[in-house]
C-alpha cells in the first residue's frame, strides 16, 4: 500500500489517494475505481480485487517482472459526504483530465494521478454513466484510433461498446490514458450508489480473467462470454411521448422483439395507462 497523491486541507483530514501494488517490475496493469462520490459499487469492486490479488500474491501467483496497481478511489472526500462531484466548485474528476500542476485542486489531482499511471500497459477504470440507468455489465472504449476491441473481448463480458468521442470526452481518464498509448478500458456494472453482489462478482472475475489472459497472473477461471462488439452510433433511443409514471416491463439484458411491450406510462392521478412503449 502506498500514497499516490495527497491533498492538504486546513479544516479536515488530508485526502490521500491510496494505491495497492502487487508484484514488481514492468508497469503492466492499473485499475482505478471511484472518481465520483456516489460510485460505491466501483470502489467495492476494487476492494474485492485488492483482496483477491493479495491472496494470489501470497501464493506466488503474480507473474515475475509484472506490476499491478489498484486504486480503489481517487475522490475519497466526495465519497465521505455522499456528493457526486468534488469540492465546493462541484468539479467532475472524470471530466478534469489531463489537468495541470498549478490550477484548481481537481486539475492538480488529475495531473498528479495521470503522471503516476500513464506508463502502464493496460488501464482499467470502473466508472459510471453520465445518466442514471440499468446496465448489462460491459466494457466501453473510446474510438481514438488506438482502441483494440480484440483486447476488450478478453474480459469475457457480454458486450464491448465503442463510442466515438465528443469534445467533452477528451477530458476523461479513458481518453487521456489512450492518448498516452495505454490500452484503456472502462468497465460498467449495473449499479453505482449501492452494492450489487452479482454484477460485482462478475466484474471481479472479468478483470482477473483479463489479467490471466495477458499473462500477468496465474489463475484458474471459466472463459466467460464471447463478447459482442457494438458501436454506440448503432444504438437507438426509445422515447416516451407522454408524461407520467414510468413502469418498466423488461430489464437490461432481456431478449425483446419488434412490437414487444417494454414499458408503460401510468397516469399519476388515476392510474390509467397513458402509453405503452413498444
Predicted regions and their residues:
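Structured catalytic-domain cores with a bias toward divalent-metal coordination
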Residues: 1-278
